[in-house]
Amino acid sequence: MVAEFQIASAQSSALTSTEEEHCSINSDKAAKLDLELTSERKNDGKQSHEVTFNEDIADPEDIARHMSTARRYYISSLITFTSMVITMISSSWTLPSTHIIEHFHISHEVSTLGITLYVFGLGIGPLFLSPLSELYGRRITFLYALTLSIIWQCLTIWSKTITGVMFGRFLSGFFGSAFLSVAGGAIADIFDKDQIGIPMAIYTTSAFLGPSLGPIIGGALYHQSYKWTFITLLITSGCCLVMIIFTIPETYKPMLLIRKAKRLRKEKNDQRYYAVLEVTREQTSLLSAIFLSTKRPFGLLLRDRMMGVLCFYTGLELAIIYLYFVAFPYVFKKLYNFGPMEIACSYIGIMVGMILSAPTCLLFQKTFEWRVKRNNGVKTPEMRFEPLFYGAFLTPVGLFIFAFTCYKHVHWIAPIIGSAIFGSGVYFVFTGVFAYTVDAYRRYAASGMACNTFVRCIMAGVFPLFGLQMYKSMGVNWAGFLLAMVTVAMIPVPFLFTKYGARLRAKSPYAWDD
């Protein structure tokens, strides 16, 4: 299930074309070149030929067919690790912020912008970087985006003004977001559909684990200069960039077809061979592609009530996690006198909850297939809500446990257990919402996911701005109770959508109607 929504999110685009009748060239040389004529078009009165890959004979450009399983997993592992580093940077600000406040003589509220602006960048960046990958390929997008992210990380580290630091945080998140929006498609490029479940599940989980690991880096280096936390992640990002430069090839099929078309034009001395992406580039500018990629997600958000509710739901879950990045240091230092490293390790509970929940995606997929079979082979998007049924209850349960076990006379492991249950619930909520979004919106799945990412990151960036003040003014227990009650209000969502989903989809201008 996790694999399916990620594949659809990464690969749905305006560049997809329908298959047409295959033709072949009647010559031995053409057979060796493995030319597949899948469509014909008229250009200046001459017949032109669109090239594609033949399933029977491997083209040299069709690199996915030549890759060993080990190399596929190496590429997906490197992309996954880089994605995790990008998300670690978002929360690594948590503990060094104390030193940043002292160094720049700023308030806690201003310091919190270091988290907020980075997460804003993660939410806004995909709207601009995804079209870049669809026109120019995965590899060049990764290289330029990670290089620019590293450059802006340098500004964050060595800027002499807090304005420069914040500007660097936003732009490093903006460009780093390519590994959250494009990476899933790159992994889908090199694995067959029946093999992609495990690598995609690992990739998806890593994006959630990164924020939990970030504070651990900050805690380990807390007694050093605040810069060393970010220098460590800068060096790690640089190592990832070097490895990507030398070991990650282009995987985007439309780009590989351009290479094949160029080879055929050169070898056959015939300029009539073309790839669809070449035509798309001629007819679509990068600016127009960016405009379309930003217009449709906002249309979905404003005109579709289902999308608005689902975006708010996932945004709320992620926002609470990021609120904890300012709340945990206050709670565990005040109640249990935790030091920096102990505070950093307190986030492991959320991480453990997500890790334990990840394998269930295979079980939910089996359950989905059973439901389809039971329904005479007819599947509906609402069948994807099963993980959300569990997540809807686990998230408030975890928050209630955390809220009412935060006492000095209660062992610190109790609220950590509550955070683990909450983390598990968050994973189920995201799995159910993402799978439903892809299945219900189909043609507009990529726009739906972009819309969800934008709302999610905006909410996650806003909540830390008032989190500490809320815990100080309301008290640890009542602030936690308030968060739990907000998630309780969301419990009916999957049940109402399961009952009325078909009716709501029929009224939606974007959703798939039965």
Curated annotation (Swiss-Prot):
One of its GO terms (biological process) is proton transmembrane transport. The chain crosses the membrane at residues 75-95, 112-132, 142-162, 171-191, 201-221, 228-248, 308-328, 343-363, 387-407, 413-433, 448-468, 478-498. It is found in: Membrane. Residues 1-74, 133-141, 192-200, 249-307, 364-386, 434-447, 499-514 are cytoplasmic. Its main location: membrane. One of its GO terms (cellular component) is cell periphery. Gene3D superfamilies: MFS general substrate transporter like domains. It is a multi-pass membrane protein. Induction: Up-regulated in cells exhibiting reduced susceptibility to azoles. Keywords: Antiport, Hydrogen ion transport, Ion transport, Membrane, Transmembrane, Transmembrane helix, Transport. It comes from the Eukaryota. One of its GO terms (molecular function) is antiporter activity. The keyword ATP-binding does not apply. Residues 96-111, 163-170, 222-227, 329-342, 408-412, 469-477 are extracellular. Belongs to the major facilitator superfamily. CAR1 family. Probable drug/proton antiporter. This is Probable drug/proton antiporter YHK8.
